[in-house]
Each structure stands twice: as C-alpha cells, then as structure tokens.
C-alpha cells in the first residue's frame, strides 16, 4: 500500500467528470476541494511539516476560505514563504490553524522574509516531503512522533541563511492569524537554541539544532539582527504590538551544500522538547536519513495492515491514499498534556468526533486496537480534568468545543471497545465519565423534557444512553441499566409519526431530511414509526433522488437564493458532509441492500 499512496490527492479542487445517473440528483453545499496537505507526517503523530502559503485550511496550497460553492483561489500557483509545523488535515473552518515555527531558506536579506517563492518541483511519500523553490533551494522534511528534521540543499552563495520565525501562526485569511500571547527564545550555544510560545492557550516548546559548525547564529527582532544577543522574551503580545522574531543561521555555501535543522517539540517545556529530539533522532548533529527511514518503516507497517486487490491502478491509489489520510489524525501525544501534571495518554486534533465517531474510529479500532485504547484513555483523562468529553479537541485551550454539532459521541467509541473486550481499559472509571457527560449541555433538557433541541441531540443522547448501558452491563451495575433503558428509548420523541421524519428544529449544517436517516439502536421500531419497510424505502428514495432530475451545483460565491434553492431539494450530499454519511446503509434494515449498493457505487464512480 505504501508505494501507492499519493499525498497530493486531496490538496486541490476535485477533478471529476460531470456526475451521471443517481449521483447527478445529489446536491452539496460544501466546496469540492480536498482540505489536506502533502507534508511529512507520522502515523497518529504529534508533528507534521509542510510548505506554507497561508492557504485555507492547512496553510498549504492555493485556495482561500470557502464554505459554500466552488473554492476561490488565493494563489494561482503553488507558492511558499517557508515551511511550517503542525497542520490540520481534512477539516474545514476549525478556527485553530497552527502552522507554527516557520523555517525559511533564503539567499535574500531578512527584509524579504514573508515573500512567497514559486514551488518549481514537489515530491512526497508517507513521512517525507520535498519542495524546490524558484530561488534554487531544495527542502526535504521528515518527522517523528514529536520531532521534525529539515534538510536544505543550497546553490553557491556568499551569504545563504536559514531563518526560523517563532512569531508565525495561522492562515492568510480574514481573522485567520494566530498571535502568540507570550514567548521566549534562548541561544544556548553555537548551533543550539530553545524557545517556547504560548499559542491558543497551549505552551509549545521547541529545541532546535543546526548541523553546520561554521555558520553564524543570531537572534533577530522586527527583521533586524541582534548580534551578540542570546535571549528574547515577550509577554502580553497582541496583534497590534506583534513584531516578527526568531533566530537565524547564515554563511557561505558551495553548490549542492546540505544543511540540516533538527526540531524537538513538546507541550511540557524546552527540556522535554530536547529529550524528545534525542530519543527520536539520536544525539545528532545530523539525523535526516535515519529519521526518514524509521518513519517510512513505521508507515509501511501501519499501511500494510490492509491489502488492496484491484485491477484498477487508480482505485488502488485512491484507496491507499484514503487509508493514509485516515491515519494522520488524531494526534496522540503521550505524556504531553500541558493542562495537568501527570504522565498520561494525551490526544488532540480530534476534529471532530462528529466527523469520526462512526467512520474513522471504527477503522482505527480494527487496524490499531492498542492505539484506539490509548485514544479512549486520553478522552477519559480530558473528561476528568476538564469536565466534559469533547466533541472537538485541538492543541488549544478554551470552551470552543463544537457542542452544537452533537452530544455524547465518545460513548459510541467507548461502547465499541467494551463490546470487543479490548484490554487496557478501566471500565468502572469510564462508566463514571460517560454517565456524567450525558447530563451536560443538552442532557439536562433531555432528562427533564424527554427531548432536546436541536432535535438531532435527542438522537445523540438516546444513543449515548444505549451505549453507556453496555458499560453498565460490563461492570454489573443493574441500577444504572434499569435507568438507562427508558432513556435510550426516547429517540422516538424526535420523530413526527405523521411524516416519518424528524420534527422541525434547528440543525447544524443540514436539515431534517439529512438527519432523519441516522442509524439507531432499534431500526425495526424506527422503520415501523415511518409506516413500515415500503414507506421507509420511499422516504429514502426521495432523499437519494431516485427517479429525480439532475440538479445544478452551487458555483463560485453563490447567492443566498442559489443556496436556498439547493437546500430546498432536501437531497443527499454524496458523503460530503457528516449528517447523512450513514444514510445509505439505512436501506439495509428495510430489506433493500441493493439500494445501498446502488448509492455506494454511484459515490465511487462519480
């Protein structure tokens, strides 16, 4: 599988033929653009690194902020102002966009920092990314779980330089920049420096080493060098007072001269960042080749858990690449929580549970059960320390946790692990937090009134009680089992028996048709409520556009009327949004697996 992965798939707007057949009747509001990047990654690792252009939403690529219609361009070609660390992958408007610690290889004065160079050549494979800039400098990057190693090949020049910018963060979109709250940077000795920035409430520490013994090392501030300076400290930074700052190595180069930079990262201070670097990359000073080989080996082992047999080279590549993308996030960072002092599993970029709880997480559990247990344990620690099981969780601090999207979504993941009997879980401890979480946010309204609005949360909470009952049974708590059974049955309160659909309500990125075909824990009763198999299939056929005319997709900067007309179709979105991802499989429960096959084949072919 490794050889068939193409990390560039999913980094551009889709290039697909005009939809035909059943797929031509579907309508989707979201832009058909892949929100991924081709940068260096490690399976479920903490660190990634890639070329930075400021584009939405990863920092890589050519596109501007887009939530509807066709994606507008930010750049006409692939460009980069340098190479940054920590990227989102597969998300949309996630609001925390990272792209910290930018490295810019330059032959120009420091005043040119921030300009965009054309990328004249790019290559990538799992764990490795390479780009050549029109300045003639080639960059290669590889990463470990908590580290990154850069290798730069320079042309001949009297004063080449590598500029590390610690003030950098976010995207080049409206309100997309991330400004550090505080920062410090310390040049320890020739070729070695450490620093820490507090960004989005998280303290990100870095230890960096340069393997060139004779290059000058200098701190800089506001694009001015600080000869002889060894330390920079900043506090209470705001956008109007921020000036770029960082460090630089500079010196003459011969044609083809190679210089390496090694980075260790940590959320627990500079000494742990240094320890991470030594543990993953050795004592140095050079470690690119070995780190790349080790990361490639790990990717081969991980991807090798799946075998793809197909005569189609295109489908082999698409499936292999999709598998690769499914194993980049969440980021597992053991013993790295900056928010509590104990050494525990820790995870971030759970972005979001709404996207992954019934899609990626079951796949992760099947392929890497021990990592699924690690993630589940991290979720429970987050719940214990922060008061709720997250819907979304990033390398950040704050209450912006996507609670409108759904409720009690971690419960499905935990119940799966419990049913499978995977070792390493404390189910008594898990039951405490699952039960407590059911009463938070919309949970109180659900308990008091039997229904919660938005109405989709009624389905979430009823299913959450069903899942938590699995844990109660595992630990033998009969009292909780008796409490949960009637609460799990309250999913019925969400539906209008006159229409067989959900009651009118507000909905997150969808309408009642999108949410009405969620897979529930009692599908027989759900189908009966809709009037039986035939009536339920009729509703599904209406939703999937069986026999309907082709529709027109929204264009560039669509008008409100254009979007309103599309939403009024109440049509399937082609697996392009979360609310109706499960819907094709609802046919199975009404005795029409052929219809499921029709929809799935239409998705694959279009």
PLM regions and their residue ranges:
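Accessory carbohydrate-recognition regions in carbohydrate-active enzymes
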Residues: 1-458, 472-493, 499-514, 518-594, ...
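ATP-dependent phospho-/nucleotidyl transfer catalytic cores
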Residues: 464
């Amino acid at each position: 599988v490794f050889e068939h992965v193409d990390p560039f798939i999913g980094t551009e707007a889709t290039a697909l033929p005009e939809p035909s057949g059943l797929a031509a009747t579907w309508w989707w509001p979201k832009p058909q653009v892949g929100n991924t990047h081709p940068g260096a990654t490690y399976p479920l690792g903490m660190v990634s690194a890639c070329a930075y252009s400021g584009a939405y939403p990863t920092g890589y690529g050519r596109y501007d902020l887009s939530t509807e219609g066709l994606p507008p361009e930010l750049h006409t070609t692939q460009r980069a102002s340098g190479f940054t660390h920590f990227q989102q992958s597969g998300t949309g408007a996630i609001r925390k966009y990272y792209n910290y610690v930018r490295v810019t290889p330059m032959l120009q004065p420091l005043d040119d920092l921030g300009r965009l160079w054309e990328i004249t050549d790019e290559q990538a494979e799992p764990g490795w990314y390479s780009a050549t800039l029109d300045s003639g400098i080639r960059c290669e990057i590889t990463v470990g779980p908590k580290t990154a190693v850069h290798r730069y090949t320079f042309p001949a020049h009297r004063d080449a330089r590598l500029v590390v910018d610690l003030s950098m963060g976010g995207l080049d979109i409206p309100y997309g920049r991330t400004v550090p709250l505080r920062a410090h940077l310390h040049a320890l000795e020739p070729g070695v420096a450490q620093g820490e920035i507090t960004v989005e409430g998280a303290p990100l520490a870095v230890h960096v080493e340069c393997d060139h013994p004779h290059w000058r090392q200098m701190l800089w501030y506001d694009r001015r060098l600080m000869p002889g300076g060894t330390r920079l400290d900043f506090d209470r930074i705001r956008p109007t007072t921020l000036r770029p700052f960082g460090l630089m190595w500079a010196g003459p180069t011969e044609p083809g001269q190679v210089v390496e930079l090694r980075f260790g990262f940590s959320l627990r201070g500079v000494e742990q960042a240094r320890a991470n670097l030594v543990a993953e990359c050795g004592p140095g000073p050079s470690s690119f080749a070995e780190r790349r080989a080790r990361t490639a080996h790990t990717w081969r082992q991980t991807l090798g858990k799946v075998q793809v047999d197909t005569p189609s080279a295109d489908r082999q590549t698409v499936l292999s690449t999709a598998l690769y993308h499914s194993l980049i996030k969440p980021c597992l960072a053991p013993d790295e929580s900056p928010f509590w002092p104990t050494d525990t599993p820790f995870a971030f970029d759970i972005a979001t549970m709404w996207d992954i709880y019934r899609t990626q997480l079951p796949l992760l559990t099947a392929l890497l059960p021990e990592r699924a247990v690690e993630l589940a344990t991290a979720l429970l620690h987050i719940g214990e320390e922060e008061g709720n099981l997250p819907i979304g969780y990033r390398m950040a601090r704050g209450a912006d946790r996507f609670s409108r999207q759904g409720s009690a979504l971690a419960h499905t993941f935990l119940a799966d692990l419990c049913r499978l009997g995977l070792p390493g879980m404390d189910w008594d401890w898990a039951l405490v937090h699952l039960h407590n979480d059911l009463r938070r946010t919309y949970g109180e309204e659900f308990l008091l009134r039997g229904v919660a609005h938005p109405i989709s949360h009624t389905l979430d909470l009823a299913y959450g009680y069903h899942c938590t009952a699995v844990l109660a049974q595992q630990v033998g708590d009969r009292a909780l089992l008796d409490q949960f059974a009637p609460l799990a049955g309250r999913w019925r309160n969400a539906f209008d028996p006159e229409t067989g659909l959900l009651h009118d309500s507000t909905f997150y990125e969808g309408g009642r048709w999108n949410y009405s075909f969620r897979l529930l824990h009692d599908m027989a009763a759900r189908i009966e409520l809709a009037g039986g198999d035939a009536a339920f299939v009729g509703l599904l056929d209406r939703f999937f556009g069986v026999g309907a005319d082709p529709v027109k997709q929204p264009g560039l900067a669509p008008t409100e009327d254009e979007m309103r007309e599309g939403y009024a179709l109440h049509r399937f979105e082609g697996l392009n949004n979360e609310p109706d991802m499960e819907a094709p499989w609802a046919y199975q429960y009404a005795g029409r697996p052929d219809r499921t096959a029709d929809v799935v084949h239409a998705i694959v072919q279009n």
